[in-house]
Amino acid sequence: RKNVEWNGHHFSSLVLDGGHNADALEALALQLEDWQFTNTTVILGMSGDKLQPVLIPMLEKIFRSCALLIACPFDSQRSVKPKELLRFLHVEIGSEKLPKTRTVRGAEEALGLAAESKENPLVVCGSFYLAGEVMQLLSD
């Protein structure tokens, strides 16, 4: 979606993607490349059982256009803690290849942080749960 308003904030472009496996993340990476997004803010939340090295090449492609990566939990016991998610990414990808990173306590805080970079496209990905929470916040 383009020109999304939330809580007095404006996002120029917003992509909600529930993909959480290699094929889905590859499709997202290709789509972001096709749209020529730059300086993207990515809100990423994942289930602990999905933290697999096989996802790294796809995540690296997504992060190429990323200026800020926000690690965000979602309301499920399966959600990986944000610091654990970033630790996994730092080990598997390397700190030098990651964009600027932040952790938050939930989707509302993540949207607030993303709103500070309002001209940047926003991509929410990694979990249907997280995408659903963001959709709910945007519809309130």
Task: Place the predicted regions along the sequence by residue.
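Nucleotide phosphate-binding/pyrophosphate-handling subdomain across enzymes
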Residues: 1-68
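C-terminal helical cap/extension that packs against the catalytic core
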Residues: 11-14, 56-121
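Active-site-adjacent beta-strand anchor residues
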Residues: 18, 45, 104, 124-125
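Short amphipathic alpha-helical segments
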Residues: 27-29, 55-57, 82-84, 135-138
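Active-site catalytic pocket residues across diverse enzymes, especially alpha/beta-hydrolases
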Residues: 32, 89, 93, 138
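Cofactor-binding loop segments of dinucleotide-utilizing enzymes, especially the Rossmann-like FAD-
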Residues: 44-48, 73-74, 126
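A glycine-rich beta-strand to alpha-helix segment
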Residues: 110-139
